[in-house]
Amino acid sequence: MKNKDKDKSTGVLLQEQLGKKWELAWKDISDKDAVIVKEISDDYIRFLTAGKTERQCVKLSVDLAEKAGFKPLEFYQKTGKINPGDKVYMIHKDKTVVFFEVGRESIEKGMAIIGAHIDSPRLDLKPSPLYESDDMAFFKTHYYGGIKKYHWVTIPLAMHGTVVKKDGETIHISIGEA
């Protein structure tokens, strides 16, 4: 054992010997690239701030896609034609969306697919959630999407949701946002 290691615990020595030493990427990044990373990060934070639910994320994604030239599948169905390079999207139940660009080569040569999903941390109401106790009404809930039970006290409380009435009318709810 080296003289400088004699005061280190066995655990520390094992960590140094077996553990991965992570280097910060910021050490090697150029000032120009740091600005680009900051801009992308800021855009992502704005998206996360505005997209609290799947429905909000779908709407935001479609708005961005339309600015980039994407059109809904219905547009192409009406025209009856789709061409190589066309940018298409399709929304399903306002909670999922698919984007694709029609390839310029035949499908026999393959295709490139990128997949992602929307995972909005939240509390969901359970089926038949309403109950009464001690002259108060309560909802039975469960948490979803990576929410940490112990983090909620440090986050401003807000309620976002969608109610679909019997007649099909949709009401969007947002309470508690600044």
Residues covered by each model-derived region:
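N-terminal hydrophobic/helix-forming segments and targeting peptides
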Residues: 1-178
